[in-house]
């Protein structure tokens, strides 16, 4: 078994959809990025890649490649799962934490868990998504961005 950790951050801006955990969340701002900027799925992807010592999402999905412009990060996470498989690993579980001042994430957590589980081909009980605010401290607390942390466990197939 191997453990991985991932972190991602994206700026909140007007004129973008807010997509977290593969869920489009109604809000006046969205996350800025080359892809759909799904901060949670990016952190999870990095955790999985790191656990298998396969680099990070920037290596596999560079923001200079037009093929990834606006791409659904669920497709990226599915590709990460396939990469793990080709290297003899499969995901066991994921624990993640999202820091975001607004909007409230709780109503969307179950769907996020289901999306992540489907991408990784694991049971939804193997996926944890938690969210908290930053108590109005720092860039997250001022509503300027969102931050996600993820820890995963993978095992040999």
Curated annotation (Swiss-Prot):
InterPro entries: MECDP_synthase, MECDP_synthase_CS, MECDP_synthase_sf. One of its GO terms (biological process) is isopentenyl diphosphate biosynthetic process, methylerythritol 4-phosphate pathway. The keyword Cell inner membrane does not apply. Pathway: Isoprenoid biosynthesis; isopentenyl diphosphate biosynthesis via DXP pathway; isopentenyl diphosphate from 1-deoxy-D-xylulose 5-phosphate: step 4/6. 4-CDP-2-C-methyl-D-erythritol 2-phosphate binds at residues 8-10, 34-35, 56-58, 61-65, 132-135, 142. A divalent metal cation binds at residues 8, 10, 42. Its EC number is 4.6.1.12. Involved in the biosynthesis of isopentenyl diphosphate (IPP) and dimethylallyl diphosphate (DMAPP), two major building blocks of isoprenoid compounds. Catalyzes the conversion of 4-diphosphocytidyl-2-C-methyl-D-erythritol 2-phosphate (CDP-ME2P) to 2-C-methyl-D-erythritol 2,4-cyclodiphosphate (ME-CPP) with a corresponding release of cytidine 5-monophosphate (CMP). Homotrimer. This is 2-C-methyl-D-erythritol 2,4-cyclodiphosphate synthase. It comes from Chloroherpeton thalassium (strain ATCC 35110 / GB-78).
């Amino acid at each position: 078994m191997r453990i991985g950790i991932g972190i991602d951050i994206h700026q909140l801006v007007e004129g973008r959809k807010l997509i977290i955990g593969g869920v489009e969340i109604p809000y006046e701002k969205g996350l800025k990025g080359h892809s759909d900027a799904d901060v949670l799925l990016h952190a999870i992807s990095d955790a999985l890649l790191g656990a298998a010592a396969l680099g990070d999402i920037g290596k596999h999905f560079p923001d200079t490649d037009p093929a990834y412009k606006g791409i659904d990060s669920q497709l990226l996470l599915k590709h990460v799962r396939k990469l793990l498989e080709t290297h003899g690993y499969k995901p066991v579980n994921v624990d993640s934490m999202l820091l975001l001042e607004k909007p409230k994430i709780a109503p969307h957590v179950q769907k996020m868990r289901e999306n992540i589980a489907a991408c990784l081909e694991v049971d939804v009980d193997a996926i944890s998504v938690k969210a908290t605010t930053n108590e109005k401290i720092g860039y997250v607390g001022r509503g300027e961005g969102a931050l996600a942390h993820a820890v995963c466990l993978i095992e040999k197939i």
